[in-house]
Amino acid sequence: MRMNLSELEIRILGCLMEKELATPEIYPLTLNALASACNQKSNRDPVMSVTEADLLRGLEALGARGLARLTTTGGRVAKYCHSATDNLRLAAAERAVLAELMLRGAQTAAELRSRGERMTEMGDIESVEETLRKLQQHGPPLVVRLPRQPGRKEQRYLQVFAGLPEFPDELDISEEMEPAAGPRAAAGRPAVGNERLERLEEGIGSLRQEIAALRREVQEMMDAFA
């Protein structure tokens, strides 16, 4: 089953999963509470501005995929909840990790551990890495590990509810690291600069090969569960 959710659908699902864990006393959410959660400025990247009409369309799409539903809790006001716990069989720590990735984008295991604590006990860094492995091996995979960015020590993880990312864009290679154009630019470089640039170019080439292999591997895994 491929997700291919829209940005709005991912925001809605992430908010429902977040509020279930972080504020269970107000969960399931009314449409107004869900709008506030989707539009809040803290713990969100990007910040969005959605209307109740947008939310109803997104909830309908999620409902068709078995990821959200309308529920009643004894009152007359319509409330909404997610169905990821049952349909995707996700534990609390797995839902917390996915909620963070949906609401803030790609993050390291350390960032997920720190930020996920507001929703549930995350354990030590090894526990978080094990949770991420389970999500990577889920059928279908729900998370991928991105190639390490140049100059950064830790690798980041990304949810794939919107489908596979364009990995080369995730490398975030700055213009300063790209080779200078033309023979005139090359002639003006000092020898040390040339050596450093060659090493960087080799590293970028290796990264692109790793990206291609990773993309093929993830695509094969997703095809197997399609």
From Swiss-Prot:
Record-linked Pfam families: DUF480
InterPro entries: DUF480 (IPR007432), WH-like_DNA-bd_sf (IPR036388), WH_DNA-bd_sf (IPR036390)
Superkingdom, natural source: Bacteria
Disulfide pattern: none
HAMAP family: UPF0502
Family: Belongs to the UPF0502 family.
Protein name, as recorded: UPF0502 protein Gbem_0194
Origin organism lineage: Bacteria, Pseudomonadati, Thermodesulfobacteriota, Desulfuromonadia, Geobacterales
